[in-house]
Curated annotation (Swiss-Prot):
Keywords: Cell adhesion, Extracellular matrix, Glycoprotein, Repeat, Secreted. Glycosylated. The keyword NAD does not apply. The lineage of its organism: Eukaryota, Metazoa, Echinodermata, Eleutherozoa, Echinozoa. GO terms for cellular component: extracellular region. This is Hyalin. The keyword Glycoprotein applies. Major constituent of the hyaline layer. The hyaline layer of echinoderm embryos is an extraembryonic matrix that functions as a substrate for cell adhesion through early development. It comes from Lytechinus variegatus.
């Protein structure tokens, strides 16, 4: 017997002996120490021959058998698995990587296990055993320990008597001593100890909000925090301070006979030691209509503590002549045309006039006058009139000098285009460089009867391009011809015949043979035998 997987082995044995009255010669098919293949049976034959040719034989078999005596090898990923549970739960479902096994036979099957992943394991240590078996019945065992430990991960529960405690102090006071009920804590362990606190009852707290933090811990070291706010508020008894913009008397003029006017002004503002002063009332506001004479406007402010303060602004409306002259412009836009390239022209036009409620309106300035030379483009002419009170009025006249374009575009036409296609083709897609045009202004393609990439039929097609400019001038048409010619480049198609075989009498040297001649077709309709 040999271990499974051993391909062969050497075998020894006691050599048979032969006894005879005369000398004996012995030969054998195999010899001790030879290698024999596993899984085979071999017959060994010994033959003994004496001097007279008498023969005696001895035969036996050698059988080499493979056997498996090696246990499977078990691999345990972790020999000790620890899982924590909260105190009082008793145990926990544990998932783990199961052991595996290998065997020299190539197969190791799980035979039994004392637990499996996902089972409930109690607090303490549990030994888990896995047994594997190979096809020969050899067993391999692997064990590991699941250790379930009770731990305390629950923090204490903190109780805060008040989330916010408010105390008042006189404005300008920096702070105050505050007494309060301290937070308490409970824990599932039965003990929660105060670990730290940022403040304690009787401390001085400054004006504003102070967050007080209490931290408790249980015997397992789990922390828990409770916070509350000490709010120290300043009390304000000082009214706001009002600032009235200078001047406090605001004067506006209105035209004589006008009952009043809408007046816009800068409003009073207020500051307060609290930082906030709110406008609570005003008898008027910017943009209101104020009558001729003096109107006292009262503004009242209040701080967050309700302290009021008032101030006044006087609006003084005075009648005056503020109406400017009324200008009449015969024509606000005057257009003259000049030939293209002419720099400008002298223009005569009717001048604006003016009237005023005082009866007098005098022309004081004008930037141009009739008969002046005006350049191509637009020139704004400004006229200014004034009444005896000095009220001015202005009007404008625009002189527009326009160049006229009467020259049509210059067209760069192209030569006729010739393309060839295969005989039988009815049309062809033709690409070509398009005609162009230039102009003193802007040349535009108005129309075209075809364009590059169009399909053109066999024969001649006349193509026309027409260009114009932005002045409406039309150039002579650009006319060229696109010719599509057909050519035949495809050879005829020959319908050949099969080889011809005829039989003649032995000794005959020739024979007249009749056969069907080959034929041919062509896309032109004619194929000639040459």
């Amino acid at each position: 017997n040999v271990e499974i997987g051993t391909p062969s082995t050497t075998v020894t044995w006691t050599v048979p002996t032969a006894i005879d009255a005369s000398a004996v010669t012995t030969v054998s098919s195999h010899n001790p120490g030879q290698s024999f293949i596993t899984g085979t049976t071999t017959t060994v034959v010994y033959t003994a021959t004496d001097e007279f040719g008498n023969i005696g034989q001895c035969a036996f078999t050698i059988t080499v058998t493979a056997t498996d005596s090696i246990d499977p090898v078990v691999t345990v990923s972790s020999g000790f698995i620890t899982q924590q549970v909260e105190i009082g739960l008793g145990g926990v479902n544990v998932f783990y990587t199961e052991p595996t096994a290998t065997d020299n036979s190539g197969t190791a099957v799980l035979f039994s296990r004392s637990a499996q992943p996902g089972d409930f394991f109690p607090v303490g240590q549990t030994v888990v055993t896995y047994i594997f078996q190979d096809p020969s019945g050899n067993f391999g065992t692997g064990t590991f320990t699941v250790n379930v430990v009770e731990v305390d991960t629950t923090p204490p529960v903190v109780t805060v008597p008040n989330g916010i405690i408010t105390r008042q102090v006189e404005i300008g006071t920096s702070g105050i001593i505050v007494f309060f009920s301290e937070p308490t804590a409970t824990d599932n362990s039965g003990t929660a100890i105060l670990d730290s606190r940022t403040h304690q009852p009787g401390d001085v707290f400054p004006v504003g909000q102070t967050i007080v933090t209490y931290t408790f811990r249980d015997p397992a070291g789990n922390p828990a925090t409770g916070t509350f706010t000490i709010n120290v508020v300043e009390v304000d008894t000082t009214p706001p301070v009002i600032t009235v913009p200078t001047p406090s008397i605001i004067t506006r003029q209105v035209e004589v006979g006008t009952p009043g006017v809408s007046v816009f002004y800068q409003e009073p503002t207020a500051t307060d030691n609290s930082g906030t002063a709110i406008l609570v009332s005003r008898t008027n506001q910017p943009g209101d209509v104020f009558p001729v004479g003096q109107t006292v406007v009262t503004y009242t402010f209040q701080d967050p503590s309700g302290n009021p303060a008032s101030a006044t602004v006087t609006i003084n409306v005075v009648e005056v002549d503020t109406t400017p002259p009324v200008i009449s412009v015969p024509s606000t836009f005057i257009t003259r045309t000049v030939e293209l390239g002419t720099p400008g022209v002298n223009v005569f036009y009717p001048e604006p006039t003016a009237s005023d409620n005082s009866g007098t309106a005098i022309l004081v300035t004008r930037t141009n006058q009739p008969g002046d030379f005006f350049s191509v483009g637009q020139t704004v002419v400004t006229y200014t009139f004034q009444d005896p009170t000095g009220n001015p009025a202005t009007a404008t006249v625009t002189i527009n000098i326009v160049e006229e374009d009467t020259t049509p575009p210059t067209v760069n036409c192209i030569n006729d285009v010739i393309r060839t296609v295969e005989l039988g083709t009815t049309s062809a897609q033709v690409f070509y460089s398009e005609p162009t045009a230039s102009d003193v202004g802007q040349a535009t393609l108005i129309s075209r009867t075809a364009q590059p990439g169009d399909s053109f039929p066999v024969g001649a097609t006349v193509v026309t391009y027409i260009f114009g400019d932005n002045a409406g001038n039309i150039a002579d048409p650009c006319v060229f011809t696109i010719t599509v010619n057909t050519v035949d480049t495809t050879p005829p198609t020959v319908n050949c015949v099969s080889d011809v075989v005829r039989v003649v009498e032995l000794g005959t040297t020739s024979l007249a043979v009749v056969y069907t001649e080959p034929t041919a077709t062509d896309i032109s309709g004619t194929a000639s035998l040459v």
